[in-house]
């Protein structure tokens, strides 16, 4: 090694720093390969795997190759990484054994001893093979021998630390392969050294950071250590990792400042609390500001120096990462944070110094970004930089106000001295910006030099900022800057220029509902309008401010007094009115009508009471309050009757008005509800709660800007309506808050009156509510006299007195003495006169006016009712009793039903009348004194009863049953029931079986009356009866009149019993009881009970040898399906017409169920020849062929499977070939002529023994 080499120059902290690699051995050899080495080393990337699970990265390695010297090796405690040699290389091209032993081996030994002394283990021996040198040497060992000797002597445990580079200056494949192997080894060793040394450095750095709570710990010292790591990452071109180091330092320092503000301060922070003496802004045009770095190292830096240097390094790295817009974002945060940190640390700052520093820093950042981006990029990223423009504008404005550059008279001597001090604190301009025409330093110095220069610079910045905000859609921010601009113009006595900006800002704040900015802007606008002489606009704004509760009471009173002062001044032009909207002066809360339904007749008095809520802070004397009313006549005036108006108007007469939404828009009330959610952030290690809070998920919906095409302020040009109809109240004092004001008017013309506009006059100032909403109307009517008659109950009942209410609405007619109602009497309806009847007179508001006795005079045809005297638009009410005579049903109304089967009769009766009462209408004609025409009314009465009758038999004994059903809701008392024969029968007696003379009948219930029929001779063929019963309401006291009884007439025919039918079932022979599935014997006995009667003389009657007989058809059916009839179930017999004549019929039946079973039904029919014209027309299922019928049990065939069935009705036995032939006809015998003596009899059937499933019939 050549010890006479010159020492290395000191390290310069620039971006050209590279990792240091020392070179020992043959320097000339290294010099020859250096160009190729420095070119080839960074060409191929290498994967760098770092510790602590950090993601691997591909890096290109570069190195700074320097001559090896012992002074370069780090001493104990030295943490400098930039001067740290990461690798030591020894170069030799020795191929001679003698030379190796004489010099090279000793040199290698010394080199390794020095490295071992300094604990350096990162080294490499490079043996360069040169073919030309071999040819010149005759006695040389093979190459492998020298390599093996070096490896044995120095690398016996690390053979990979010795590499061979073959002919590095030649261009051959062997040379290229040698270079590739060498470069790979070199990169690998370098990365291993980086990983090892950086890991150790990071561990030491973390150890130092963990000692930050110990006394004597210095942030500046730690700053230098971590920045050393950042320099190494930057040297390796790992700019992201380098930026992370500065961000960690930034966060650590910020946390200490916050803790200091909370009372937990560190001692070393006192170094940064020294007063600020220089405010020359950020320096971003140098890679490293060595001056500020050295001041930090010496612990002499101020807070601004530290923040400036830290941000300059972050800016440099962000620009290398091509993230210039993040520079702007971070710069804005930095400037705001620095202002707050100076306050927290209570650092002494001269007035305006911080404004200068912020202004210079904003422009410095903007110019630095402009220097690395083209115009298109800048224009498309205005959103990132506009905040800096706005902040610079704000600080320049503050400097202008501070230095007296905005005042009307210009700066004074004190302002000038302050300006000189601020410019002195800037110091001399930096060399890197000295030749820049528009440097931040020159701009600030020029702006503070004169009033004109300041105005130029401030207006340029303001207009540029407004234009930028507008271009990106941030209208609110643009209006805020415009508002500052308006304040500037007001100070410059140019209100005409300020108004447009104030109006724009106010419009935006109103659209978005910002209460406090609205108030502040209106105050500025009021001052502007006052200077411009805009009286009407100024009064409108003053009224809004006087009602604004965000102002103090004194401010509100001031603006209210401005309005009152103007109103008290005499007007130059009499009659001139200044019309202002009312919502700021007072609000209409509610309105109340008296009468409450807002309906009044012509000539009546209507009161309208309104509640006005005064917004003014002091009592205000109002000369008059006027309500303009619009009069209209309904086209469909027939609807506007008093009855219609009364039913369709509000009952309480109170109308509430929605509160005014000014100064906020309607859209604010329709914003979506807040969607608030809890947020928890827990530690991933132990799940402990770190932070909690509330987040709003729909903030983008709540804070979005809402455009409005028109101004949301109430326009001052409100039209004042002039009309013939007004409600007026004069000389009213409106106290702050709610005030009751009453208007009175007398109705003159019928129609609808709509309240349109509310006005209040204070001198020549009129406050107007242009539209009263919701719509408020009152109606004036002129009514014709009317008569209404209606029952007091839901329905009128016939036969008992019922009360009817008469209502006379006088309308425009006046009832005079002697006026009466003339009622024509109906035949079946009586009007009952009572001495105590009285008439009551009511006003149209249903208040009782008078009461008088009712005089009623009756004659045969007319009933006269004298009316009491009553004025117009009153109501007369009185009640009368009427009685409708109950009408009896038509004769024989149900007599034709008695000859038919009982079920069919009941069905028809129900279908005809159902459960409804029979009604009767009575029409009455009434002559009224106010009309030449008669009024016809109809009263409907309902018969409360429904009556039916039936014939009952017990052998030859006969009974008549009458059922009276009460269909009404009242209870009645029945008495004196009678049943009489209206025919000519003298030997017939009706014996009543009801012994009670009086019997109650309740609502929806029935009462039955029974009489037995007795006769001594032959009974008559028919019986004509009349049933009558007296009735009266059960709840009434003794009536003043006697009521007519209720009557019912009916007719009974063919009621004498001719035949007795008896059926009996016998078990099979040898059995005591019938069994299921076994054939049993059915015996039917038909007995004639009388000799020949008049009713027997028909086509079925035949005569032979003075004996008469008739043909009957019997049928056995089982409707309950308990029995199966085997064989033929019907037949025709010839029955002698003589008393006690008997015919027996035998057939077999089979029980289908076990238990007590009722006997099958046996029916009898008259068998009429086909030519009979008097027989009933039955359906085809009732036609029975004579040849197929048999009454002889022994002549029947044995039953088969097809004939074993249950019979439910008469079945046809004719074949298809007989369908077209004339058939005999059947006529059912009336129910009174046949008596079934076995009806209700049951037979015990026991189950068969072999049945697995037992079915039992229970009846």
Curated annotation (Swiss-Prot):
Entry keyword set: Autism spectrum disorder, Disease variant, Dwarfism, Epilepsy, ER-Golgi transport, Golgi apparatus, Intellectual disability, Phosphoprotein, Transport
GO BP terms in the entry: early endosome to Golgi transport; endoplasmic reticulum to Golgi vesicle-mediated transport; intra-Golgi vesicle-mediated transport; vesicle coating; vesicle tethering
Segments traversing the membrane: none
Tissue distribution: Expressed in all tissues examined.
Phosphoserine modification, residue list: 708
Subcellular location: Golgi apparatus, cis-Golgi network
Pfam families associated with the record: Ig_TRAPPC10, TRAPPC10, TRAPPC10_1st
Signal peptide limits: none
Stretches for region Disordered: 1189-1222
A single cellular component GO annotation: TRAPPII protein complex
Disease: Neurodevelopmental disorder with microcephaly, short stature, and speech delay: An autosomal recessive disorder characterized by global developmental delay, short stature, severely impaired intellectual development, microcephaly, poor or absent speech, and behavioral abnormalities including autistic features and aggressive behavior.
Assembly behavior: Specific component of the multisubunit TRAPP II complex, which includes at least TRAPPC1, TRAPPC2, TRAPPC3, TRAPPC4, TRAPPC5, TRAPPC6A/B, TRAPPC9, TRAPPC10 and TRAPPC14. TRAPPC9, TRAPPC10 and TRAPPC14 are specific subunits of the TRAPP II complex. Interacts with TRAPPC14.
PANTHER family in the record: EPILEPSY HOLOPROSENCEPHALY CANDIDATE 1/TMEM1, TRAFFICKING PROTEIN PARTICLE COMPLEX SUBUNIT 10
Job description of the protein: Specific subunit of the TRAPP (transport protein particle) II complex, a highly conserved vesicle tethering complex that functions in late Golgi trafficking as a membrane tether.
UniProt similarity note: Belongs to the TRAPPC10 family.
Name of protein: Trafficking protein particle complex subunit 10
């Amino acid at each position: 090694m050549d010890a006479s080499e010159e020492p290395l120059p000191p390290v310069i902290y620039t971006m050209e720093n590279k990792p240091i690699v020392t070179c020992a051995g043959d320097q000339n050899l290294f010099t020859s390969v250096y160009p190729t080495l420095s070119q080839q080393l960074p060409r191929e990337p290498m994967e760098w795997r770092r510790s602590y699970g950090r993601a691997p990265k591909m890096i290109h390695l570069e190195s700074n190759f320097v001559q090896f010297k012992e002074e370069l090796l780090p001493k104990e405690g030295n943490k400098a990484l930039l001067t740290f040699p990461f690798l030591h290389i020894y170069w030799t091209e020795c191929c001679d054994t003698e030379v190796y032993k004489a010099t090279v081996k000793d040199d290698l030994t010394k080199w390794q001893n020095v490295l071992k002394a300094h604990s350096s283990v990162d080294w490499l021996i490079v043996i360069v093979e040169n073919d030309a040198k071999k040819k010149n040497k005759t006695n040389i060992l093979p190459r492998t021998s020298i390599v093996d000797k070096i490896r044995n002597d120095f690398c016996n445990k690390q053979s990979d630390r010795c590499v061979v580079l073959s002919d590095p200056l030649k261009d051959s494949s062997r040379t290229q392969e040698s270079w590739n192997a060498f470069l790979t080894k070199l990169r690998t060793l370098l990365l291993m050294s980086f990983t090892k040394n950086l890991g150790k450095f990071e561990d030491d750095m973390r150890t130092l950071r963990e000692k930050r709570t110990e006394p004597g710990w210095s942030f500046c010292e730690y700053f230098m250590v971590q920045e050393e790591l950042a320099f190494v990452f930057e040297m390796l071109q790992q700019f992201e990792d380098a930026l992370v180091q500065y961000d960690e330092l930034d966060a650590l320092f910020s946390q200490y400042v916050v803790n200091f503000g909370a009372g937990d301060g560190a001692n070393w922070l006192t170094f940064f609390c020294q007063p600020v003496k220089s405010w020359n802004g950020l320096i971003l045009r140098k890679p490293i500001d060595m001056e500020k770095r050295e001041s930090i190292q010496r612990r002499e830096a101020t807070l601004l120096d530290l923040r400036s240097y830290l941000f300059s390094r972050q800016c440099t790295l962000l620009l290398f990462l091509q993230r210039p817009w993040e520079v702007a974002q971070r710069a804005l945060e930095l400037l705001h944070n620095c202002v707050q940190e100076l306050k927290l640390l209570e650092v002494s700052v001269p007035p305006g110094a911080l404004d200068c520093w912020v202004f210079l820093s904003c422009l410095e950042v903007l110019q630095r970004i402009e220097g690395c981006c083209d115009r298109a990029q800048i224009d498309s990223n205005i959103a990132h930089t506009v905040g800096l423009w706005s902040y610079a504008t704000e600080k320049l404005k503050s400097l202008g106000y501070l230095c007296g550059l905005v005042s009307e008279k210009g700066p004074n001597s004190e302002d000038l001295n302050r300006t000189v001090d601020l410019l002195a604190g800037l110091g001399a301009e930096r060399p890197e910006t000295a030749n820049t025409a528009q440097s931040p330093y020159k701009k600030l110095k020029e702006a503070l030099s004169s009033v004109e220069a300041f105005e130029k610079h401030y207006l340029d910045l303001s207009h540029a900022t407004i234009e930028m905000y507008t271009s990106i859609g941030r209208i609110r921010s643009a209006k805020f800057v415009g508002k500052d601009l308006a304040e500037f113009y007001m100070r410059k006595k140019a209100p005409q220029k300020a108004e447009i900006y104030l109006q724009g800002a106010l419009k935006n704040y109103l659209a978005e509902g910002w209460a406090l900015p609205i108030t502040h802007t209106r105050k500025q606008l009021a001052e502007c309008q006052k200077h411009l002489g805009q009286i009407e606009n100024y009064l409108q704004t003053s009224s809004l401010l006087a009602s604004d509760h965000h102002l103090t009471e004194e401010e509100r009173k001031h603006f209210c007094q401005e309005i009152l002062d103007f109103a008290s001044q005499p007007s130059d032009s009499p009659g001139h009115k200044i019309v202002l909207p009312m919502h700021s002066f007072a609000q209409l809360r509610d309105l109340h009508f008296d009468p409450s339904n807002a309906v009044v007749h012509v000539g009546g008095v209507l009161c309208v009471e309104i509640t006005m809520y005064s917004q003014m802070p002091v009592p205000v004397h109002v000369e008059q309050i006027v309500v303009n009313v619009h009069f209209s006549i309904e086209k469909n005036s027939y609807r506007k009757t008093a009855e219609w108006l009364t039913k369709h108007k509000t009952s309480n007469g109170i109308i509430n008005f929605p509160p005014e939404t000014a100064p906020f828009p309607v859209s604010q009330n329709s914003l979506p509800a807040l969607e608030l959610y809890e947020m928890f952030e827990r530690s991933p290690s132990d799940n402990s709660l770190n932070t909690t809070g509330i987040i709003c998920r729909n903030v983008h919906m709540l804070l979005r800007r809402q455009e409005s095409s028109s101004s949301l302020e109430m326009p001052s040009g409100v039209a004042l309506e002039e009309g013939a109809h007004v409600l007026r109240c004069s000389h009213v004092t409106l106290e702050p808050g709610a005030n009751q004001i009453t208007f009175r008017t007398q109705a003159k013309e019928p129609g609808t009156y709509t309240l349109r506009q509310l006005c209040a006059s204070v001198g020549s100032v009129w406050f107007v509510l242009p539209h009263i909403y919701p719509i408020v109307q009152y109606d004036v009517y002129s009514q014709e006299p009317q008569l209404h008659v209606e029952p007091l109950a839901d329905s009128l009942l016939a036969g008992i007195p019922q009360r009817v209410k008469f209502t006379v609405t006088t309308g425009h007619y006046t009832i005079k003495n002697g006026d009466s109602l003339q009622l024509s009497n109906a035949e079946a309806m009586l009007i009952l006169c009572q001495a105590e009847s009285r008439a009551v007179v009511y006003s149209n508001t249903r208040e009782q006016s008078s009461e008088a006795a009712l005089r009623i005079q009756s004659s045969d045809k007319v009933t006269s009712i004298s009316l009491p005297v009553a004025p117009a638009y009153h109501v007369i009410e009185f009640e009368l009793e009427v009685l409708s005579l109950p009408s009896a049903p038509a004769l024989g109304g149900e007599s034709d039903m008695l000859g038919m089967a009982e079920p069919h009769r009941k069905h028809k009766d129900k279908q005809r009348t159902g459960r409804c009462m029979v009604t009767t209408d009575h029409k009455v004609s009434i002559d009224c004194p106010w009309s030449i025409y008669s009024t016809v009314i109809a009263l409907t009465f309902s018969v409360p009863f429904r009556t039916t009758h039936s014939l009952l038999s017990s052998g030859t004994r006969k009974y008549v049953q009458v059922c009276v059903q009460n269909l009404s809701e009242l209870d009645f008392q029945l008495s004196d029931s009678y049943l009489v024969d209206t025919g000519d029968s003298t030997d017939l007696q009706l014996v009543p079986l009801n012994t009670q003379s009086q019997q109650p009948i309740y609502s929806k219930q029935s009462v039955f009356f029974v009489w037995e029929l007795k006769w001594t001779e032959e009974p008559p063929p028919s019986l004509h009866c009349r049933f009558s019963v007296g009735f009266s309401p059960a709840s009434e006291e003794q009536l003043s009149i006697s009521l007519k009884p209720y009557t019912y007439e009916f007719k009974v025919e063919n009621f004498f019993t001719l035949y007795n039918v008896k059926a009996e079932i016998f078990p099979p022979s040898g059995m005591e009881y019938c069994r299921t599935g076994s054939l049993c014997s059915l015996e039917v006995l038909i007995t004639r009970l009388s000799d020949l009667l008049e009713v027997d003389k028909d086509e079925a009657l035949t005569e032979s040898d003075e004996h008469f007989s008739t043909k009957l058809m019997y049928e056995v059916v089982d409707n309950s399906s308990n029995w199966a009839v085997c064989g033929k179930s019907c037949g025709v017999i010839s029955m002698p017409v003589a008393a006690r004549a008997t015919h027996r019929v035998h057939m077999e039946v089979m029980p289908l169920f076990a238990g007590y079973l009722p006997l099958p039904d046996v029916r009898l029919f008259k068998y009429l020849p086909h030519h009979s014209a008097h027989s009933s027309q039955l359906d085809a299922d009732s036609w029975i062929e004579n040849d197929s019928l048999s009454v002889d049990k022994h002549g029947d065939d044995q039953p088969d499977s097809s004939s074993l069935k249950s019979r439910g009705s008469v079945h046809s036995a004719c074949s298809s070939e007989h369908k077209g032939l004339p058939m005999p006809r059947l006529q059912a015998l009336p129910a009174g002529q046949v008596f079934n003596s076995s009806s209700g009899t049951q037979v015990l059937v026991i189950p068969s023994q072999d049945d697995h499933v037992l079915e039992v019939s229970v009846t």
